[in-house]
Amino acid sequence: MGGSVIVIDSKAAWDAQLAKGKEEHKPIVVDFTATWCGPCKMIAPLFETLSNDYAGKVIFLKVDVDAVAAVAEAAGITAMPTFHVYKDGVKADDLVGASQDKLKALVAKHAAA
């Protein structure tokens, strides 16, 4: 089964994915992004690749902070890109910025745990 990044388009979709991650005991990695954010566009292909590499082990979500502002505000997003890791419905880790090495390490750390 190939991986894929799930685009969150509503608070309800966000809540459903957090519940799914909790139910399946899978970590969720979220990319908080914006269409106008250059660094976000640069790291997006890596995020997509990681979703394939960790298919079945990790749930990958993408949240456009302008399209789903309520989710971004609730998550306390102040800069893009910001990556959050959720485990059992609770934020477990985060990364601010478009560092490819740090993003790879973040996903690997939580996929193995």
From Swiss-Prot:
Pfam families: Thioredoxin (PF00085). The record marks 31 as: Deprotonates C-terminal active site Cys. The keyword Electron transport applies. The keyword Electron transport applies. The record marks 38-39 as: Contributes to redox potential value. Transmembrane segments: none annotated. Residues 2-112 form the Thioredoxin domain. GO terms for cellular component: cytoplasm. CDD domains: TRX_family. InterPro entries: Thioredoxin-like_sf, Thioredoxin_CS, Thioredoxin_domain. Disulfide bonds join 37-40. It is found in: Cytoplasm. The active site is at residues 37, 40. Belongs to the thioredoxin family. Plant H-type subfamily. This thioredoxin cannot be used as a substrate for E.coli NADPH: thioredoxin reductase, but is a substrate of spinach ferredoxin-thioredoxin reductase and can activate NADP-MDH. Participates in various redox reactions through the reversible oxidation of the active center dithiol to a disulfide. The H form is known to activate a number of cytosolic enzymes. This is Thioredoxin H-type.
